[in-house]
Amino acid sequence: MKRLMISAMASGSGKTVLTCGLLAALTARGHAAQALKCGPDYIDPMFHEKVLGVPSRNLDLFLQGEDGVRRTLLKQKGDYVVVEGAMGFYDGVNGTDRASAWQVARTASLPVVLAIRPGGSSLTLAAQVKGLLTVRAASQIRRLILTACRPALYAHLAPILEQETGLPVLGYLPP
């Protein structure tokens, strides 16, 4: 079973749209996919369920602990498991990284695709990504994808991000 996490720098970055789009694409290609959501969120899993037709579960380190998260992940059936992060990648309980998407990714050894909603920056955006790569050990971030991005902006930003961060940019989702 292949698995990955979709996370972001902050809420409102397009994680749910990206996750649902990926789930729909996998299903359309004949793959059995399962979705999970970090934390105690019960709204986003309803979107996952709508796309897949099967329930989506939560991975919640605060409530389940590390063993519970690993057990939940191992129980999933199918070819792919897509885990959607919550809030910003390092945002956990009470302003700490405890029970954050980063901690879930680290606990479950999940590679992370970071969804980035570009604003009015380019090199500064690369600096923010580099900060995410280094603020904690073993960030698990392996790929980038731009969300709410126009083709011309993608053509400008992708090479900058790849050169400055060393991470491949997979593509973009239009606004």
Model-derived features: where do they sit?
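ATP-dependent carboxylate-amine ligase catalytic core
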Residues: 2-108, 116-143, 151-155, 162
